[in-house]
Amino acid sequence: MITSPLLAYVAILFFCVLKASSLDTFIAAVYEHAAILPDAPLTPVSHEEALMLMNRNLDLLEGAVTSAAKQGAHIIVTPEDGVYGFFFSRESIYSYLEDIPDPHVNWIPCTNPSRFGHTPVQKRLSCLARDNSIYIVANIGDKKPCNASDPDCPHDGRYQYNTDVVFDSEGRLVARYHKQNLFLGEDQFDAPKEPEIVTFDTTFGRFGIFTCFGILFHDPAVTLVKDFQVDTILFPTAWMNVLPHLTAIEFHSAWAMGMRVNFLAANIHFPLRKMTGSGIYAPDSPRAFHYDMKTKEGKLLLSQLDSHPHRPAVNWTSYASGLPTPLVGNQEFKSTVFFDEFTFLELKGVAGNYTVCQKDLCCQLSYRMLEKREDEVYALGAFDGLHTVEGSYYLQICTLLKCKTMDLHSCGDSVETASTRFEMFSLSGTFGTQYVFPEVLLSDIQLAPGEFQVSSDGRLFSLKPPSGPVLTVTLFGRLYERDSASGASADLVAQGLRVMLGVIITIMYSLSW
């Protein structure tokens, strides 16, 4: 019979061993991969031909994994679509898919590759992780048969999922995530019936995973942080940059800061589709990032992160709500930012305090420029409404931005360079949400690590003069509970815009091949 003192001793010993094996910091790696694409992605090929292409991409990923492991990385994230590319049909993607089991089966494909059928891609990823003693995050395709007993079963008798997989340092499959929020043009894949919440624990923290477009929605992204207390998000993506507020490095670093977690973003590298921008982001500042529209090369990033980052919560409306309500003046004007109509005020002096409102949101800006240039216009904008283009999601945004030209109606158009330097800025707003993501983007699409901070009362302010001219300073708020609060007319407009955007994206794809 085991006595209770002995049980207590064993429990204490186990706790001590567990604590001794845990790491306060770890080295993260992300790889922006320039994928080798199929010549004719809409044409079905044999599994052998598909595997040849995937192995060519895996050869490149192997080089990145090996290099990262030699530099001490504990985990590496690779991009969405990185193994086979994109723009497939439902039929043409099929030869690239494998059956990916639930990780609870406790499977190491490297040592038992035939347990779940023919799985050469999973075997290779597993062996790569095992041989290099590193966690590997990859994006591949899953297939699951179904039949008429399932009323949702697709016409071809199978579900096809855009899938993230994670193999641990022994090559064991420890996580599988089926992408929930499919983007326009992803008709080759099905969305799972319910959002999947996928986490796994390591000696260097708890990890959660989701893919690309999902960052704009509550589930699973926010749920992973709020309800499952993950320390680090793993984020394979094929992200098309959209200025002024949705470039990859800008928004992903802002999400890390707003949600107060580490964020490892690996983007595909394909400048013809405006796809670039990867990074390793901590809650207080970016640790490493890469944005390159000029070359065709991939890029490996590494940086050290805290295993359990802890940042204080922010009251995003505290400061701005204490300010007097401004009178609506005749200097306001309207201009469109990514199909949304903002209310703007032009910044007319070298320094000043401005407030602009739209609906329930008032945005307050204090700033000082080094000089007021005659050839550039900056404006303070507010938007409080439902965005209905590539998806429906409710936004509250306060933004200081450079206008494309001297014409005020160009405020919100895409612009990549600026010349105006700021000495300081402080931006706040009366947000109706706790989910606000602070962005600072400098000329030539560069971040400003260590140059700004968010206060506990909701101000985004500069710590020193920014190191480059400012493109935008933005507080990007999400009101998830109002995403479906659209009327019939808004739905009709959204449907038309989605069709138009889908046609544009299809044309972009076809021109790329």
From Swiss-Prot:
One of its GO biological process terms is:
pantothenate metabolic process
Spell out the SUPFAM superfamilies in the cross-references.
Carbon-nitrogen hydrolase (SSF56317)
- Keywords recorded for this protein, A-Z: Cell membrane, Glycoprotein, GPI-anchor, Hydrolase, Lipoprotein, Membrane, Signal
What are the recorded GO MF terms, alphabetically?
pantetheine hydrolase activity
Catalytic positions? Answer: 80 (proton acceptor), 179 (proton donor), 212 (nucleophile)
Class of the enzyme per the UniProt entry, highest EC level: hydrolase
GO cellular component: a single term: plasma membrane
Source species, domain of life: Eukaryota
The catalysed reaction is: (R)-pantetheine + H2O = cysteamine + (R)-pantothenate
Task: Give every CN hydrolase domain span.
Answer: 40-307
Q: What is its EC number?
A: 3.5.1.92
By its UniProt entry, which InterPro entries does this protein fall under? Biotinidase-like_euk (IPR012101), Biotinidase/VNN (IPR040154), C-N_Hydrolase (IPR003010), C-N_Hydrolase_sf (IPR036526), Vanin_C (IPR043957)
Tissue-specific expression: Detected in kidney (at protein level).
* Record carries keyword Cytoplasm: no
Q: Quote the subcellular location field of this record.
A: Cell membrane
Lipid modification (GPI-anchor amidated glycine) maps to 487
Question: Which Pfam families does the protein's record reference?
Answer: CN_hydrolase (PF00795), Vanin_C (PF19018)
- Glycosylated residues are 147, 315, 353
The record ties this protein, via PROSITE patterns, to: CN_HYDROLASE (PS50263)
| Propeptide residue range(s) | 488-513
| General function of this protein | Amidohydrolase that hydrolyzes specifically one of the carboamide linkages in D-pantetheine thus recycling pantothenic acid (vitamin B5) and releasing cysteamine.
What do we know about how this protein assembles, alone or with others?
Monomer.
Family under the similarity heading? Belongs to the carbon-nitrogen hydrolase superfamily. BTD/VNN family.
- Its name, as the record gives it, is Pantetheinase
Please name the source species: Sus scrofa
